[in-house]
A protein has these predicted regions:
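Conserved N-terminal ligand/cofactor-binding loop architecture of enzyme catalytic domains
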Residues: 1-73, 140-191
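Active-site and donor-binding regions of nucleotide-sugar-utilizing enzymes
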Residues: 49, 54-145
Length: 191
């Protein structure tokens, strides 16, 4: 709902890292934090996707190595946090689903969505408010934009939070307006 909670201090401390002299060395070492012993095939896919998005990020801005490492640590924290939910009892050709409500608000979320787009996970990003700018752009993501917009702060868990009038409801309201406003006919006296 809105944004992915930032990694906690404990999650960050669990990520092994060293001092690096280059991007390739840093990516190779950081991806060793991705462990999924249940499926070596999936672990290889996760490592490859991590390396791919980190190289894309390094090439886009000619970013400073420490800043890139910080982004990598955030990404690894989120991978470790969500991998068991996304890949529980994973078998080849299984696909998890990650639903994000609202636009991606920071570069770390964008990086995580790019990562998820490269692993066996369907990524659904719902941005019902068209005035909210999403920072995410990726050729692997299919984007659909509708003309209507609505302000919705969090994902509706019960339908009590969201009410959309049907065509019949709006027709009834319009008929009420035409018949009962500025006339001598009153609804409560109608039989």
């Amino acid at each position: 709902n809105g944004s992915i909670p930032n990694p906690t201090t404990d999650e960050i401390m669990k990520i092994r890292r060293n001092h690096y002299t280059g991007v390739e060395q840093m990516i190779a070492d950081l991806q060793m934090n991705i462990q999924y012993p249940v499926s070596p095939v999936l672990q290889a896919v996760l490592c490859r996707a991590f390396a791919e998005v980190m190289k894309l990020e390094a090439g886009e801005l000619e970013i400073n190595l420490n800043r890139l490492m910080n982004k990598g640590v955030y990404l690894l924290c989120w991978i470790q946090r969500y991998q068991n939910q996304l890949f529980k009892n994973w078998k080849k050709n299984d696909t998890g689903c990650f639903i994000h409500m609202g636009a991606c608000q920071n570069v770390n979320e964008v990086l995580f969505m790019k990562f998820l787009a490269r692993v066996p996970v369907d990524v659904l990003i719902l941005c019902p408010d068209r005035n909210e700018h999403c920072m995410l752009e990726d050729t692997l993501l299919y984007e659909i934009n509708y003309e209507t917009s609505m302000k919705l702060d969090q994902f509706p868990e019960q339908n009590a939070q969201l009410h959309i009038g049907t065509a019949a409801y709006h027709a009834e309201r319009e008929l009420d307006t035409l018949m009962y406003n500025d006339s001598v006919i009153f609804r409560d006296q109608q039989f």
